[in-house]
Amino acid sequence: MSERAAGILMPISSLPSEYGIGCFSKSAYEFVDWLKKAGQSYWQILPLGPTSYGDSPYQSFSTFAGNPYFISLEALVEEGVLTKAECEAVDWGKVKGSIDYKKIYEGRYPLLRKAYERSNVHENAAYQQFVKENSWWLSDYALFMAVKDRFDGVEWKLWADDIKLRWGPAMDYYREELYFDIEFQQYMQFKFYEQWMQLKAYANKKGIQIIGDIPIYVAMDSADTWAHPELFQLDEENVPVAVAGCPPDGFSATGQLWGNPLYRWGYHKETGYQWWISRLAYVFRLYDVVRIDHFRGFDEYFSIPYGAETAVDGHWEKGPGMDLFWKVREALGEKPVIAEDLGYVTDSVRDLVRDSGFPGMKVLEFAFDSRDSGSANDYLPHNYPVNSVAYTGTHDNETLAGWWGSISKDEQKLTREYLCDTYTPEAELNKPLISLIMRSAAKWCVIPMQDYLGLDNKCRMNTPSTVGTNWKWRIRKNQLSVKLQKEIHAVTLRYGRMNWTEDVEEAAEAEK
Protein backbone atom coordinates (compact mmCIF):
# COMPACT_ATOMS: atom_id res chain seq x y z
CA MET A 1 0.00 0.00 0.00
CA SER A 2 1.07 3.56 -0.67
CA GLU A 3 1.46 6.26 1.96
CA ARG A 4 -1.48 7.61 3.94
CA ALA A 5 -4.26 8.55 1.56
CA ALA A 6 -7.99 9.15 1.36
CA GLY A 7 -10.77 8.44 -1.09
CA ILE A 8 -14.50 8.64 -1.61
CA LEU A 9 -16.98 5.82 -2.27
CA MET A 10 -19.26 7.01 -5.06
CA PRO A 11 -20.96 4.54 -7.44
CA ILE A 12 -20.98 5.43 -11.14
CA SER A 13 -24.77 5.14 -11.05
CA SER A 14 -24.94 7.86 -8.38
CA LEU A 15 -23.22 10.54 -10.47
CA PRO A 16 -25.24 13.47 -11.80
CA SER A 17 -26.26 13.07 -15.44
CA GLU A 18 -28.84 14.26 -17.92
CA TYR A 19 -30.47 10.93 -18.65
CA GLY A 20 -31.66 9.15 -15.53
CA ILE A 21 -28.54 7.41 -14.20
CA GLY A 22 -24.91 8.26 -13.59
CA CYS A 23 -22.65 7.21 -16.46
CA PHE A 24 -19.34 7.95 -18.21
CA SER A 25 -20.51 11.42 -19.22
CA LYS A 26 -19.01 14.87 -18.68
CA SER A 27 -20.22 14.74 -15.06
CA ALA A 28 -17.88 11.81 -14.37
CA TYR A 29 -14.89 13.82 -15.58
CA GLU A 30 -16.02 16.79 -13.50
CA PHE A 31 -16.22 14.50 -10.46
CA VAL A 32 -12.60 13.44 -11.03
CA ASP A 33 -11.58 17.11 -11.06
CA TRP A 34 -13.61 17.66 -7.89
CA LEU A 35 -11.89 14.73 -6.16
CA LYS A 36 -8.47 16.06 -7.12
CA LYS A 37 -9.24 19.53 -5.73
CA ALA A 38 -10.51 17.89 -2.53
CA GLY A 39 -7.10 16.25 -2.05
CA GLN A 40 -8.36 12.72 -2.66
CA SER A 41 -6.26 9.87 -4.05
CA TYR A 42 -8.93 7.20 -4.61
CA TRP A 43 -12.34 6.91 -6.19
CA GLN A 44 -14.03 3.70 -5.06
CA ILE A 45 -16.93 2.43 -7.13
CA LEU A 46 -19.26 -0.58 -7.09
CA PRO A 47 -19.10 -3.48 -9.60
CA LEU A 48 -19.64 -2.36 -13.20
CA GLY A 49 -21.34 -5.49 -14.57
CA PRO A 50 -24.75 -5.59 -16.31
CA THR A 51 -27.44 -5.90 -13.66
CA SER A 52 -30.42 -8.23 -13.60
CA TYR A 53 -33.65 -8.37 -11.57
CA GLY A 54 -33.26 -6.28 -8.42
CA ASP A 55 -30.64 -4.02 -10.05
CA SER A 56 -27.86 -5.22 -7.75
CA PRO A 57 -24.33 -4.80 -9.14
CA TYR A 58 -23.46 -7.92 -7.13
CA GLN A 59 -25.87 -10.04 -9.21
CA SER A 60 -24.66 -9.60 -12.76
CA PHE A 61 -25.29 -11.36 -16.06
CA SER A 62 -21.52 -11.59 -16.52
CA THR A 63 -18.26 -11.53 -14.59
CA PHE A 64 -16.53 -9.74 -17.47
CA ALA A 65 -19.12 -7.57 -19.24
CA GLY A 66 -19.92 -3.94 -18.48
CA ASN A 67 -23.30 -2.36 -17.76
CA PRO A 68 -24.73 -0.65 -20.88
CA TYR A 69 -26.54 1.79 -18.55
CA PHE A 70 -23.16 3.48 -17.99
CA ILE A 71 -22.52 4.25 -21.66
CA SER A 72 -22.62 8.02 -22.12
CA LEU A 73 -25.45 8.99 -24.44
CA GLU A 74 -23.92 12.48 -24.69
CA ALA A 75 -20.80 10.91 -26.21
CA LEU A 76 -22.94 9.03 -28.73
CA VAL A 77 -24.61 12.32 -29.65
CA GLU A 78 -21.16 13.83 -30.24
CA GLU A 79 -20.31 10.84 -32.46
CA GLY A 80 -23.40 11.57 -34.54
CA VAL A 81 -25.13 8.23 -33.97
CA LEU A 82 -27.82 9.75 -31.72
CA THR A 83 -29.42 13.18 -31.50
CA LYS A 84 -29.97 15.23 -28.38
CA ALA A 85 -33.66 15.43 -29.25
CA GLU A 86 -33.92 11.62 -29.26
CA CYS A 87 -32.35 11.44 -25.81
CA GLU A 88 -34.49 14.22 -24.39
CA ALA A 89 -37.69 12.68 -25.75
CA VAL A 90 -37.36 9.73 -23.35
CA ASP A 91 -39.03 9.80 -19.92
CA TRP A 92 -36.14 9.13 -17.52
CA GLY A 93 -38.18 9.51 -14.34
CA LYS A 94 -39.42 12.38 -12.24
CA VAL A 95 -37.11 12.31 -9.19
CA LYS A 96 -33.68 13.81 -9.87
CA GLY A 97 -32.07 12.27 -6.80
CA SER A 98 -33.17 8.71 -7.58
CA ILE A 99 -32.92 6.14 -10.37
CA ASP A 100 -36.07 4.73 -11.96
CA TYR A 101 -34.65 1.44 -13.27
CA LYS A 102 -37.83 0.51 -15.11
CA LYS A 103 -37.65 3.70 -17.17
CA ILE A 104 -33.89 3.29 -17.67
CA TYR A 105 -34.44 -0.22 -19.03
CA GLU A 106 -37.26 0.90 -21.31
CA GLY A 107 -35.46 4.02 -22.51
CA ARG A 108 -31.79 3.19 -22.87
CA TYR A 109 -31.78 0.03 -24.93
CA PRO A 110 -33.86 1.41 -27.84
CA LEU A 111 -31.49 4.40 -28.02
CA LEU A 112 -28.42 2.17 -27.90
CA ARG A 113 -29.93 0.01 -30.64
CA LYS A 114 -30.36 3.10 -32.82
CA ALA A 115 -26.76 4.07 -32.16
CA TYR A 116 -25.59 0.58 -33.13
CA GLU A 117 -27.62 0.56 -36.35
CA ARG A 118 -26.16 3.92 -37.39
CA SER A 119 -22.60 3.13 -36.37
CA ASN A 120 -21.34 0.91 -39.22
CA VAL A 121 -19.48 -0.81 -36.43
CA HIS A 122 -18.45 -3.74 -38.61
CA GLU A 123 -16.21 -1.30 -40.49
CA ASN A 124 -14.57 -0.04 -37.29
CA ALA A 125 -11.06 -1.47 -36.86
CA ALA A 126 -11.01 -0.71 -33.12
CA TYR A 127 -14.28 -2.62 -32.70
CA GLN A 128 -12.92 -5.59 -34.64
CA GLN A 129 -9.79 -5.60 -32.47
CA PHE A 130 -11.87 -5.43 -29.28
CA VAL A 131 -14.04 -8.38 -30.37
CA LYS A 132 -10.97 -10.42 -31.28
CA GLU A 133 -9.07 -9.72 -28.06
CA ASN A 134 -12.10 -10.43 -25.85
CA SER A 135 -13.62 -13.35 -27.74
CA TRP A 136 -12.77 -15.72 -24.86
CA TRP A 137 -15.67 -14.24 -22.86
CA LEU A 138 -17.49 -11.88 -25.25
CA SER A 139 -18.62 -14.54 -27.72
CA ASP A 140 -20.53 -16.51 -25.08
CA TYR A 141 -21.84 -13.39 -23.34
CA ALA A 142 -23.21 -11.79 -26.51
CA LEU A 143 -24.95 -15.01 -27.53
CA PHE A 144 -26.28 -15.48 -23.99
CA MET A 145 -27.83 -12.00 -23.93
CA ALA A 146 -29.23 -12.29 -27.46
CA VAL A 147 -30.91 -15.62 -26.65
CA LYS A 148 -32.16 -14.24 -23.32
CA ASP A 149 -33.78 -11.32 -25.16
CA ARG A 150 -35.34 -13.72 -27.67
CA PHE A 151 -36.89 -15.65 -24.76
CA ASP A 152 -38.24 -12.47 -23.10
CA GLY A 153 -35.58 -12.37 -20.41
CA VAL A 154 -36.32 -15.68 -18.69
CA GLU A 155 -33.51 -17.39 -16.77
CA TRP A 156 -31.37 -19.70 -18.89
CA LYS A 157 -32.27 -22.70 -16.74
CA LEU A 158 -35.81 -22.36 -18.21
CA TRP A 159 -34.65 -22.35 -21.85
CA ALA A 160 -35.24 -25.30 -24.18
CA ASP A 161 -32.76 -28.10 -23.47
CA ASP A 162 -30.93 -27.76 -26.78
CA ILE A 163 -29.70 -24.22 -26.09
CA LYS A 164 -29.78 -24.54 -22.30
CA LEU A 165 -27.27 -27.38 -22.56
CA ARG A 166 -25.41 -25.76 -25.48
CA TRP A 167 -25.89 -28.53 -28.04
CA GLY A 168 -23.89 -27.87 -31.20
CA PRO A 169 -26.75 -27.54 -33.72
CA ALA A 170 -28.65 -25.16 -31.42
CA MET A 171 -25.56 -23.01 -30.87
CA ASP A 172 -25.01 -22.77 -34.64
CA TYR A 173 -28.67 -21.98 -35.27
CA TYR A 174 -28.88 -19.12 -32.78
CA ARG A 175 -25.53 -17.63 -33.83
CA GLU A 176 -26.91 -17.34 -37.36
CA GLU A 177 -30.51 -16.47 -36.45
CA LEU A 178 -29.51 -13.76 -33.95
CA TYR A 179 -26.46 -12.41 -35.80
CA PHE A 180 -27.42 -8.73 -35.55
CA ASP A 181 -28.62 -9.06 -31.95
CA ILE A 182 -25.27 -10.62 -31.05
CA GLU A 183 -23.41 -7.84 -32.84
CA PHE A 184 -25.51 -5.29 -30.94
CA GLN A 185 -24.42 -6.84 -27.64
CA GLN A 186 -20.80 -6.73 -28.77
CA TYR A 187 -21.19 -3.10 -29.83
CA MET A 188 -22.49 -2.12 -26.38
CA GLN A 189 -19.53 -3.84 -24.73
CA PHE A 190 -17.15 -2.08 -27.10
CA LYS A 191 -18.61 1.35 -26.27
CA PHE A 192 -18.65 0.57 -22.55
CA TYR A 193 -15.00 -0.47 -22.57
CA GLU A 194 -13.91 2.41 -24.80
CA GLN A 195 -15.64 5.04 -22.66
CA TRP A 196 -14.59 3.53 -19.33
CA MET A 197 -10.93 3.27 -20.31
CA GLN A 198 -10.97 6.91 -21.44
CA LEU A 199 -12.44 7.96 -18.08
CA LYS A 200 -9.95 5.83 -16.13
CA ALA A 201 -7.04 7.26 -18.12
CA TYR A 202 -8.26 10.77 -17.32
CA ALA A 203 -8.53 9.95 -13.61
CA ASN A 204 -5.05 8.44 -13.56
CA LYS A 205 -3.60 11.53 -15.27
CA LYS A 206 -5.14 13.60 -12.49
CA GLY A 207 -3.52 11.36 -9.88
CA ILE A 208 -6.77 9.60 -8.97
CA GLN A 209 -6.68 5.80 -8.66
CA ILE A 210 -9.82 3.71 -9.19
CA ILE A 211 -10.77 1.14 -6.55
CA GLY A 212 -12.97 -1.41 -8.28
CA ASP A 213 -15.11 -4.05 -6.62
CA ILE A 214 -15.79 -7.65 -7.58
CA PRO A 215 -18.24 -10.09 -5.99
CA ILE A 216 -16.70 -13.39 -4.96
CA TYR A 217 -19.64 -15.25 -6.55
CA VAL A 218 -21.35 -15.08 -9.92
CA ALA A 219 -25.10 -14.98 -10.45
CA MET A 220 -26.85 -18.23 -11.34
CA ASP A 221 -28.52 -16.52 -14.29
CA SER A 222 -25.28 -15.48 -15.96
CA ALA A 223 -23.23 -16.19 -19.04
CA ASP A 224 -20.55 -17.62 -16.74
CA THR A 225 -22.67 -20.46 -15.39
CA TRP A 226 -24.29 -21.13 -18.77
CA ALA A 227 -21.00 -21.29 -20.67
CA HIS A 228 -18.90 -22.95 -17.96
CA PRO A 229 -21.07 -25.14 -15.70
CA GLU A 230 -18.00 -27.23 -14.87
CA LEU A 231 -16.73 -24.37 -12.67
CA PHE A 232 -19.71 -24.59 -10.31
CA GLN A 233 -21.51 -27.04 -8.05
CA LEU A 234 -24.22 -27.96 -10.57
CA ASP A 235 -25.75 -31.36 -11.30
CA GLU A 236 -26.00 -33.07 -14.71
CA GLU A 237 -29.02 -30.89 -15.56
CA ASN A 238 -27.04 -27.77 -14.56
CA VAL A 239 -29.19 -27.23 -11.47
CA PRO A 240 -27.31 -26.04 -8.34
CA VAL A 241 -26.52 -28.62 -5.70
CA ALA A 242 -25.96 -25.94 -3.07
CA VAL A 243 -25.94 -22.14 -2.99
CA ALA A 244 -24.17 -19.34 -1.15
CA GLY A 245 -25.24 -17.25 1.81
CA CYS A 246 -24.41 -16.31 5.39
CA PRO A 247 -25.38 -17.97 8.67
CA PRO A 248 -27.72 -16.42 11.23
CA ASP A 249 -26.12 -13.64 13.30
CA GLY A 250 -26.98 -10.60 15.40
CA PHE A 251 -28.54 -8.90 12.38
CA SER A 252 -30.62 -11.79 11.01
CA ALA A 253 -32.12 -14.76 12.86
CA THR A 254 -32.39 -16.80 9.64
CA GLY A 255 -29.16 -15.67 7.99
CA GLN A 256 -28.83 -14.51 4.40
CA LEU A 257 -29.75 -16.66 1.40
CA TRP A 258 -27.91 -15.20 -1.60
CA GLY A 259 -28.67 -18.03 -4.01
CA ASN A 260 -25.42 -17.85 -5.99
CA PRO A 261 -23.96 -21.15 -7.20
CA LEU A 262 -20.89 -22.29 -5.29
CA TYR A 263 -17.55 -22.99 -6.91
CA ARG A 264 -16.29 -26.49 -7.58
CA TRP A 265 -12.98 -25.68 -5.94
CA GLY A 266 -11.48 -29.10 -6.67
CA TYR A 267 -11.86 -28.47 -10.40
CA HIS A 268 -10.38 -24.98 -10.08
CA LYS A 269 -7.36 -26.45 -8.29
CA GLU A 270 -6.92 -29.12 -10.99
CA THR A 271 -6.88 -26.42 -13.68
CA GLY A 272 -4.40 -24.23 -11.82
CA TYR A 273 -7.14 -21.70 -10.96
CA GLN A 274 -6.98 -20.50 -14.55
CA TRP A 275 -10.48 -19.00 -14.52
CA TRP A 276 -9.67 -16.94 -11.43
CA ILE A 277 -6.35 -15.84 -12.90
CA SER A 278 -8.12 -14.75 -16.09
CA ARG A 279 -10.80 -12.96 -14.08
CA LEU A 280 -8.33 -11.02 -11.94
CA ALA A 281 -6.06 -10.23 -14.89
CA TYR A 282 -9.06 -8.72 -16.65
CA VAL A 283 -10.30 -6.63 -13.72
CA PHE A 284 -6.83 -5.20 -13.19
CA ARG A 285 -7.13 -3.76 -16.68
CA LEU A 286 -10.28 -1.98 -15.54
CA TYR A 287 -9.18 -0.86 -12.07
CA ASP A 288 -6.04 0.21 -10.22
CA VAL A 289 -7.02 -1.51 -6.96
CA VAL A 290 -9.56 -4.30 -6.51
CA ARG A 291 -11.76 -4.89 -3.48
CA ILE A 292 -12.85 -8.53 -3.30
CA ASP A 293 -16.24 -8.92 -1.65
CA HIS A 294 -16.80 -11.64 0.99
CA PHE A 295 -13.10 -12.51 1.23
CA ARG A 296 -13.78 -14.96 4.03
CA GLY A 297 -15.35 -17.25 1.41
CA PHE A 298 -11.84 -18.17 0.26
CA ASP A 299 -11.13 -19.59 3.73
CA GLU A 300 -14.52 -21.17 4.39
CA TYR A 301 -17.78 -20.71 2.53
CA PHE A 302 -21.32 -21.23 3.78
CA SER A 303 -23.10 -23.94 1.79
CA ILE A 304 -26.92 -23.99 1.82
CA PRO A 305 -28.91 -26.86 0.24
CA TYR A 306 -30.51 -25.75 -3.02
CA GLY A 307 -34.22 -25.10 -2.52
CA ALA A 308 -33.93 -24.09 1.14
CA GLU A 309 -36.00 -21.04 2.06
CA THR A 310 -33.52 -19.70 4.63
CA ALA A 311 -29.85 -20.13 5.52
CA VAL A 312 -30.60 -21.95 8.78
CA ASP A 313 -29.69 -25.41 7.44
CA GLY A 314 -26.41 -24.34 5.87
CA HIS A 315 -22.93 -25.46 6.92
CA TRP A 316 -19.33 -24.36 6.44
CA GLU A 317 -17.07 -25.90 3.78
CA LYS A 318 -13.35 -25.37 3.33
CA GLY A 319 -12.27 -22.94 0.59
CA PRO A 320 -9.01 -22.83 -1.40
CA GLY A 321 -7.17 -20.55 1.02
CA MET A 322 -3.70 -19.30 0.13
CA ASP A 323 -3.32 -21.97 -2.58
CA LEU A 324 -5.41 -19.76 -4.89
CA PHE A 325 -3.50 -16.56 -4.12
CA TRP A 326 -0.10 -18.20 -4.54
CA LYS A 327 -1.15 -19.25 -8.05
CA VAL A 328 -2.51 -15.78 -8.79
CA ARG A 329 0.74 -14.23 -7.57
CA GLU A 330 2.80 -16.58 -9.74
CA ALA A 331 0.79 -15.58 -12.80
CA LEU A 332 0.17 -11.87 -12.21
CA GLY A 333 2.73 -10.74 -9.65
CA GLU A 334 1.84 -8.58 -6.66
CA LYS A 335 -1.47 -6.81 -7.15
CA PRO A 336 -3.20 -4.25 -4.90
CA VAL A 337 -6.24 -5.98 -3.38
CA ILE A 338 -8.51 -4.95 -0.51
CA ALA A 339 -9.93 -7.94 1.37
CA GLU A 340 -13.53 -7.42 2.49
CA ASP A 341 -13.21 -9.32 5.76
CA LEU A 342 -16.32 -8.06 7.55
CA GLY A 343 -19.00 -10.05 9.34
CA TYR A 344 -18.35 -13.36 11.07
CA VAL A 345 -14.54 -13.55 11.22
CA THR A 346 -12.68 -16.53 12.67
CA ASP A 347 -9.00 -16.96 13.48
CA SER A 348 -8.49 -18.86 10.22
CA VAL A 349 -10.00 -15.95 8.25
CA ARG A 350 -7.66 -13.55 10.06
CA ASP A 351 -4.76 -15.86 9.22
CA LEU A 352 -5.71 -15.88 5.53
CA VAL A 353 -5.92 -12.08 5.38
CA ARG A 354 -2.57 -11.81 7.17
CA ASP A 355 -0.87 -14.42 4.97
CA SER A 356 -2.19 -12.79 1.80
CA GLY A 357 -0.70 -9.45 2.82
CA PHE A 358 -3.87 -7.71 1.64
CA PRO A 359 -5.29 -4.91 3.80
CA GLY A 360 -8.57 -5.74 5.48
CA MET A 361 -11.47 -3.37 6.14
CA LYS A 362 -12.44 -1.52 9.30
CA VAL A 363 -15.93 -0.04 9.58
CA LEU A 364 -16.60 2.60 12.22
CA GLU A 365 -20.32 1.82 12.53
CA PHE A 366 -19.48 -1.64 13.86
CA ALA A 367 -17.40 -0.22 16.73
CA PHE A 368 -20.35 0.83 18.89
CA ASP A 369 -23.12 -1.47 17.63
CA SER A 370 -24.10 -4.21 20.10
CA ARG A 371 -25.97 -6.10 17.34
CA ASP A 372 -22.65 -7.02 15.75
CA SER A 373 -21.69 -10.58 16.64
CA GLY A 374 -18.01 -9.88 15.98
CA SER A 375 -15.56 -8.14 18.27
CA ALA A 376 -16.47 -4.46 18.34
CA ASN A 377 -13.02 -3.63 19.70
CA ASP A 378 -11.51 -4.51 16.32
CA TYR A 379 -13.45 -1.61 14.83
CA LEU A 380 -12.49 1.06 17.38
CA PRO A 381 -10.21 3.43 15.43
CA HIS A 382 -7.31 3.30 17.90
CA ASN A 383 -7.01 -0.42 17.09
CA TYR A 384 -6.82 -0.07 13.29
CA PRO A 385 -3.60 -1.58 11.94
CA VAL A 386 -1.58 0.35 9.38
CA ASN A 387 -2.31 -2.29 6.74
CA SER A 388 -6.04 -1.65 6.61
CA VAL A 389 -8.64 0.51 4.89
CA ALA A 390 -10.95 2.49 7.18
CA TYR A 391 -14.58 3.26 6.31
CA THR A 392 -17.40 4.97 8.16
CA GLY A 393 -19.68 2.46 6.42
CA THR A 394 -20.03 0.61 3.13
CA HIS A 395 -22.75 0.38 0.48
CA ASP A 396 -24.42 -2.30 2.65
CA ASN A 397 -24.54 -0.16 5.78
CA GLU A 398 -26.72 2.66 6.97
CA THR A 399 -25.48 6.17 6.32
CA LEU A 400 -23.76 7.69 9.35
CA ALA A 401 -26.80 9.87 10.02
CA GLY A 402 -29.13 6.89 9.64
CA TRP A 403 -26.92 4.73 11.84
CA TRP A 404 -26.88 7.34 14.59
CA GLY A 405 -30.65 7.40 14.63
CA SER A 406 -30.91 3.60 14.78
CA ILE A 407 -28.52 2.82 17.65
CA SER A 408 -29.61 2.87 21.29
CA LYS A 409 -29.16 5.79 23.68
CA ASP A 410 -26.46 3.79 25.48
CA GLU A 411 -24.59 3.28 22.22
CA GLN A 412 -24.93 6.97 21.40
CA LYS A 413 -23.53 7.81 24.85
CA LEU A 414 -20.62 5.40 24.34
CA THR A 415 -19.88 6.95 20.96
CA ARG A 416 -19.85 10.49 22.33
CA GLU A 417 -17.61 9.44 25.21
CA TYR A 418 -15.18 7.87 22.76
CA LEU A 419 -15.27 11.07 20.70
CA CYS A 420 -14.91 13.23 23.85
CA ASP A 421 -17.73 15.20 22.26
CA THR A 422 -20.95 15.98 24.09
CA TYR A 423 -21.76 19.22 22.32
CA THR A 424 -21.81 18.71 18.53
CA PRO A 425 -25.43 18.77 17.24
CA GLU A 426 -26.63 15.42 15.92
CA ALA A 427 -27.06 16.87 12.43
CA GLU A 428 -23.31 17.61 12.31
CA LEU A 429 -21.94 14.49 14.03
CA ASN A 430 -20.80 13.11 10.69
CA LYS A 431 -17.84 15.53 10.80
CA PRO A 432 -16.21 14.41 14.08
CA LEU A 433 -16.98 10.77 13.23
CA ILE A 434 -15.22 11.11 9.87
CA SER A 435 -12.28 12.86 11.56
CA LEU A 436 -12.10 9.95 13.99
CA ILE A 437 -11.15 7.44 11.31
CA MET A 438 -9.20 9.93 9.19
CA ARG A 439 -6.71 10.28 12.05
CA SER A 440 -6.45 6.51 12.61
CA ALA A 441 -3.31 4.56 11.68
CA ALA A 442 -5.04 2.92 8.68
CA LYS A 443 -3.12 3.89 5.57
CA TRP A 444 -6.23 4.42 3.46
CA CYS A 445 -9.50 5.97 4.50
CA VAL A 446 -12.56 5.83 2.21
CA ILE A 447 -15.74 7.74 3.04
CA PRO A 448 -19.10 7.20 1.30
CA MET A 449 -20.23 10.45 -0.30
CA GLN A 450 -23.53 10.29 1.61
CA ASP A 451 -21.59 10.56 4.89
CA TYR A 452 -19.69 13.65 3.83
CA LEU A 453 -23.06 15.16 2.91
CA GLY A 454 -24.66 14.10 6.21
CA LEU A 455 -27.55 12.34 4.44
CA ASP A 456 -30.01 10.01 6.18
CA ASN A 457 -31.09 6.46 5.30
CA LYS A 458 -33.32 7.66 2.48
CA CYS A 459 -30.02 7.90 0.62
CA ARG A 460 -28.71 4.51 1.76
CA MET A 461 -27.37 2.51 -1.16
CA ASN A 462 -28.44 -1.00 -0.13
CA THR A 463 -30.24 -2.85 2.63
CA PRO A 464 -29.16 -6.52 2.42
CA SER A 465 -31.89 -9.15 1.94
CA THR A 466 -34.32 -6.61 0.48
CA VAL A 467 -35.31 -5.92 -3.13
CA GLY A 468 -36.92 -2.98 -4.88
CA THR A 469 -35.67 0.06 -2.98
CA ASN A 470 -31.90 -0.32 -3.37
CA TRP A 471 -29.14 1.07 -5.63
CA LYS A 472 -31.21 4.17 -6.46
CA TRP A 473 -29.47 7.11 -4.80
CA ARG A 474 -28.04 9.85 -7.02
CA ILE A 475 -26.21 12.99 -6.03
CA ARG A 476 -27.46 16.34 -7.29
CA LYS A 477 -24.96 18.52 -9.08
CA ASN A 478 -25.31 21.36 -6.58
CA GLN A 479 -24.35 19.01 -3.73
CA LEU A 480 -20.83 18.77 -5.17
CA SER A 481 -20.15 22.26 -3.87
CA VAL A 482 -16.89 24.16 -3.50
CA LYS A 483 -17.69 24.49 0.23
CA LEU A 484 -17.84 20.70 0.71
CA GLN A 485 -14.74 20.28 -1.44
CA LYS A 486 -12.81 22.66 0.84
CA GLU A 487 -14.05 20.89 3.98
CA ILE A 488 -12.88 17.52 2.63
CA HIS A 489 -9.57 19.07 1.55
CA ALA A 490 -9.07 20.46 5.07
CA VAL A 491 -9.70 17.19 6.94
CA THR A 492 -7.58 15.27 4.42
CA LEU A 493 -4.68 17.70 4.87
CA ARG A 494 -5.08 17.80 8.66
CA TYR A 495 -4.51 14.06 9.02
CA GLY A 496 -1.72 13.63 6.49
CA ARG A 497 -3.73 12.01 3.69
CA MET A 498 -3.35 14.62 0.93
CA ASN A 499 -2.84 13.70 -2.70
CA TRP A 500 0.25 15.68 -3.66
CA THR A 501 0.71 14.10 -7.10
CA GLU A 502 0.89 16.52 -9.98
CA ASP A 503 -1.55 16.49 -12.84
CA VAL A 504 0.39 14.78 -15.65
CA GLU A 505 -0.70 17.26 -18.31
CA GLU A 506 -0.18 20.32 -16.09
CA ALA A 507 3.29 19.10 -15.12
CA ALA A 508 4.20 18.60 -18.79
CA GLU A 509 3.00 22.12 -19.63
CA ALA A 510 5.04 23.59 -16.76
CA GLU A 511 8.22 21.99 -18.10
CA LYS A 512 7.82 23.56 -21.56
What are the roles of these predicted feature ranges?
Residues 1-39:
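Mature N-terminal, pre-catalytic/accessory segment of carbohydrate-active enzymes
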Residues 2, 11, 17, 55-193, ...:
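Alpha-amylase-like alpha-glycosidases and glucanotransferases acting on alpha-linked glucans and related
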Residues 26-51, 286-287, 437:
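Catalytic domains of carbohydrate-active enzymes, especially glycoside hydrolases
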Residues 36, 196-204, 329, 353-354:
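Surface-exposed amphipathic alpha-helices with a cationic face
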Residues 46, 209-211, 215, 289, ...:
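Outer-envelope exported proteins of Gram-negative bacteria
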Residues 185, 189-218:
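Conserved, well-ordered alpha-helix/loop/beta-strand core segments that scaffold catalytic motifs
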Residues 454-512:
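Structured C-terminal cap/extension of enzyme domains
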